[in-house]
Curated annotation (Swiss-Prot):
Residues 80-173 form the Toprim domain. This is Recombination protein RecR. The gene is recR. Belongs to the RecR family. Transmembrane segments: none annotated.
Length: 198
């Protein structure tokens, strides 16, 4: 049996979303079909409103619905700290920690030559004028090969500008047992250890 063309189209469009394969798209399509029309209209309205109202902050490239994002607009933020992250979701994760009071710069990806992503496809160039001598730039890219390569590339660009470049620490999660840690995570936890007594 073949699916009706409108269902095929819906499955195809849903499968274009990140992390959604054909089977997940099919399940979502059937789920949406079962929902009341009002729920579907509300979802469609939310999608259209988000596309209409949201844009990137012209300073840090985080997502906002205002002229500048909340962080860039907040004068109480530490202007001597810029945390460079891969995606807008990373900003939310760091903000949730409650431990960071500086600014951000969102790259919208990582260097990935295999996928055709070079420096020109990321928001790297607009970061450079924001950097001042003595300012600390925290590189908070992921621990993937691409994340590490992006951090190294940025370090080489930023250090000649007089910036103090640091990388976020990696290691064991809170409550994690050593026996369950992989070798790379455990190695980084040991290398990035902190002194606790003088």
């Amino acid at each position: 049996m073949k699916y009706p063309p409108s269902l095929v189209s819906l499955i195809r469009e849903l499968s274009r979303l990140p992390g959604i394969g054909p089977k997940s798209a099919q399940r979502l399509a059937f789920h949406l079909f079962e929902q009341p029309r009002e729920d579907i209209e509300r979802l469609a309205g939310a999608l259209l409103a988000a596309k209409r109202d949201l844009h990137t902050c012209p300073v840090c490239f985080n997502i906002t619905d205002a002229e500048r994002c909340d962080v860039c607009s907040d004068p109480s933020r530490d202007q001597n700290l810029i945390c460079v992250v891969e995606e807008p979701g990373d900003v939310i994760a760091i903000e949730r920690s409650g431990e960071y009071r500086g600014l951000y710069h969102v790259l919208h990806g990582v260097l990935s030559p295999m996928n055709g992503v070079g420096p020109e496809k990321l928001h790297i160039k607009p970061l450079l004028p924001r950097v001042q001598e003595g300012q600390e730039i925290i590189l908070a890219t992921g621990t993937t090969v691409e994340g590490d390569a992006t951090a190294l590339y940025l370090q080489r660009l930023l250090e000649p500008l007089g910036a103090v470049v640091s990388r976020i620490a990696y290691g064991l999660p809170v409550g994690g047992a050593l026996e369950y840690a992989d070798e790379v995570t455990l190695g980084r936890a040991l290398t990035g250890r902190q002194r606790v007594s003088k």
